[in-house]
């Protein structure tokens, strides 16, 4: 349509100019010749209009697919951006769930293990157990120890002398709590590591020399809050009570390598 308008304007502006030129160049031209010339001009303009129209349509036929393809590409690009955005949101949500459900518990467990190892290396493994801390304040800890001892004695049906706490003059002091020998270094010769699995589920570890008296195991039990009258030791595999006799060393009772011992409550007796 635009091309036809251009042709029309060109024709209207060209007719007067052609007439003037003809009158100047051929002053004696007749009306018949003038009409014939105008017919030829009109025919030429018609042919020119037809050529322009066909050419424009032909060019538009090549141009329209390109525009269509460009629009399709823009739509596809927008669609891909939307899909990528959704994928990124889904991946971010998965990463958050992974951090919350897997990574964070794993880090907390790792920190707990490092804390347990630190306390075991510094000889403060009693902080990890749920036993009684002996040798504390004589006012409150004495009363709590007496109460727990009586309750344990009632549940275990122990003889009467064990249910009564000694008089103040006969009460054991902190000095009577068994002392453990100094823990040898890990690189020392004849050293073994004993892991003690408590009823609470905690596992305590300590190093001893094979030449130490086997009584040191019971002293260790008492020191972390498990009295030998209420608890016993047994081997993990095969499961059997640990036989300890006076004068025997750890090597004599079979503890020659790193060993796991089970600390369990004694059975009730009627």
UniProtKB/Swiss-Prot annotation:
It is found in: Endoplasmic reticulum membrane. GO terms for molecular function: protein-macromolecule adaptor activity; ubiquitin binding. InterPro entries: Ubiquitin-like_domsf, UBX_dom, UBX_domain-protein, UBXN8. Residues 1, 55-270 are cytoplasmic. Keywords: Endoplasmic reticulum, Membrane, Phosphoprotein, Transmembrane, Transmembrane helix. Residues 23-33 are lumenal. The keyword Cytoplasm does not apply. Residues 130-171 are annotated as: Disordered. Involved in endoplasmic reticulum-associated degradation (ERAD) for misfolded lumenal proteins, possibly by tethering VCP to the endoplasmic reticulum membrane. May play a role in reproduction. This is UBX domain-containing protein 8. It comes from Homo sapiens.
